[in-house]
Amino acid sequence: MSRLLHAEEWAEVKELGDHHRQPQPHHLPQPPPPPPPQPPATLQAREHPVYPPELSLLDSTDPRAWLAPTLQGICTARAAQYLLHSPELSASEAAAPRDEVDGRGELVRRSSGGASSSKSPGPVKVREQLCKLKGGVVVDELGCSRQRAPSSKQVNGVQKQRRLAANARERRRMHGLNHAFDQLRNVIPSFNNDKKLSKYETLQMAQIYINALSELLQTPSGGEQPPPPPASCKSDHHHLRTAASYEGGAGNATAAGAQQASGGSQRPTPPGSCRTRFSAPASAGGYSVQLDALHFSTFEDSALTAMMAQKNLSPSLPGSILQPVQEENSKTSPRSHRSDGEFSPHSHYSDSDEAS
């Protein structure tokens, strides 16, 4: 009997075990799920119908859930649309929001579909895409738009303008210089009218012409023309003499030479020194005369041409028109020729002039 009861009890226990084994998974204690991330207050107030509850299914460890609070400053609705249509979501999770999104969501899906990859894009790329979709709105806080450096075209334009301005200034300067040389060529005489003088030749001819005019003004009208000075005294020709003294009376050149030889009041001139034509002191019978350009009568062109013809070099040397004739007995200083045809500033002066 006891054995039969034991079998009946075993059957009851077995039935109870089968009965309790089926609902057993429903009664097991389960850990509470982590609280879903709460959407921002601005999102609940403004874009609540566009922000579906599918975002609550995201785990707190999912990096896509971290992007939502980062993007709440620009456009939260677009951030939600980007998260819902990211390639990480499965087809079942993304089916409902695809039906609810509007035309803006379609643009987001088209732009994100071309740039989809195995990894979800970082917050910087998401920020740039959302800023582009907002229609060019500038957000200075997030740095979506940056000030662009001046392009190479603008820099090249500025450099071209400066170069053109410098070229124009140099062109005006050369035109003014050429005009001044043309005016100088018109006033100086030229023996070869067919050939246009160069700038260097024009300056040399102007120097010869000025020296000839100064000698003509310094020559007395009734007296004998004194001999020309040596080349070392050419610096004296550049200054006009305002006063000159000469001896009067009926004395001739022989008497004057005898007076200079016998008289002890005058100091003899050394052979190497520079003698001027009118530097001798006036004698007892002499008197000084103030020379003025207005007191002289106008000279003829033939006299000036003959005077300048005496200053030309021999035809065998090049540039004979430019250089005056040098006396054989005069002491000349060597000229330092340069490669460009110019002379040094002290080429026309001797060492004795520089020392004095």
Curated annotation (Swiss-Prot):
GO BP annotations listed: auditory receptor cell fate determination; auditory receptor cell fate specification; axon development; axon guidance; central nervous system neuron differentiation; cerebral cortex development; epithelial cell apoptotic process; inner ear morphogenesis
Bias type Low complexity, positions: 110-124, 252-266
Origin: domain of life: Eukaryota
Keywords: Activator, Developmental protein, Differentiation, DNA-binding, Neurogenesis, Nucleus, Transcription, Transcription regulation
Subcellular location: Nucleus
GO molecular function, one term: E-box binding
Residue span, bHLH domain: 161-213
Pfam families: HLH
Start-end of Basic and acidic residues biased regions: 1-21, 96-109, 337-356
Coiled-coil parts of chain: none
PROSITE patterns named in the record: BHLH
Residue span of region Disordered: 1-56, 92-125, 218-279, 314-356
GO CC terms of this entry: nucleus
Biased composition (Pro residues): 26-40
UniProt xrefs under InterPro entries: ATOH1_bHLH, bHLH_dom, bHLH_transcription_factors, HLH_DNA-bd_sf
First and last residue of the signal peptide: none
Quaternary state and interactors: Efficient DNA binding requires dimerization with another bHLH protein.
Main function: Transcriptional regulator. Activates E box-dependent transcription in collaboration with TCF3/E47, but the activity is completely antagonized by the negative regulator of neurogenesis HES1. Plays a role in the differentiation of subsets of neural cells by activating E box-dependent transcription.
Protein name per the record: Transcription factor ATOH1
Organism the protein comes from: Pan troglodytes
Top-level taxonomy: Eukaryota, Metazoa, Chordata, Craniata, Vertebrata
